[in-house]
Amino acid sequence: MKTNEWISDVPVYEPGKPIEEVARELGFADVSEIIKVASNENELGPSPKALKAMAAAAPEMHRYPDGGCFYLKDKLSAKLGVKPQNLLFGNGSNELIEFLGHVYLGSGTNLVMSECAFVVYRLVAALFNAQVIAAPMKKFAHDLDAMLAAVTPETRMVIICNPNNPTGTIVSSAKIKSFLKKLPAHVLAVFDEAYFEFMPDDKKPDLIKEIQKGRENVIVLRTFSKAYGLAGLRIGYAVGHEKLIALLNRVRQPFNVNAMALAAAL
């Protein structure tokens, strides 16, 4: 059978072992003695309100979820000060990164990222047979000038994880504003803000304002996995220009966000 040849070169993500298995191998009787640091999970767990909402939703699990995330979209758009059309939800922000790959990446294209950043960016680029250009960092922080210098006519996206995973460094609002002024209009700036809620308020860049102003080549990705402790439910969201969100919605499968995740996030 004929297949897409490059798929054989896509690396397979290898998840860590379950804590229970690690405990068994190391001879620990109590799994609470082991702390799993690889996935940056919130050890406080979900909010009691989220647990209550999930319990209330459980009897309706025979129903398909709200495919348009209507109520969550309505509530979150009001909180962020954007229109519902500026929002898209995914099965974790990982799925949203894959949506971006569907829309922007392919053979002969590339994405620019820092040399030490979230592994999924490389996996998604490989999935669509796109090149990764890894820009050098300064003291484990994004060097936005180096990232700009790496942009070519074939570049479709520049991905900035802020705060960065795994180095934990933050790019200032001033540097981001300067970066956006210089970024070519044909390139999408993707800001992965999975750890946004952990930043001090005076360090948080307000990229939502760029979207409110109508800027088309900026998208912000956030998640309920980290600060809200809902990693096991897989729910994240994108904020972007409504034209961009409409394109991403075309590659989204129906019912991609499960009903339990919707209940907990709401």
Regions found by a protein language model. Give the residues of each.
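N-terminal "arm"/small-domain region of PLP-dependent enzymes with the aminotransferase-like
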Residues: M1-R63
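Short acidic capping loops at alpha-helix termini that bridge into adjacent secondary structure
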Residues: S32-E33, K83-L87, S107-N110, E154, ...
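Short beta-strands and strand-loop turn motifs
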Residues: K36-A38, A134-A135, M157-P163, A189-E193
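Phosphate-binding glycine-rich loop
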Residues: H62-N110
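PLP-dependent aminotransferase class I/II
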Residues: G68, N217-L266
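PLP-dependent aminotransferase-like
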Residues: V103-I160
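Active-site pre-lysine segment of PLP-dependent enzymes
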Residues: L144-E154, P166-A189, E193-A227
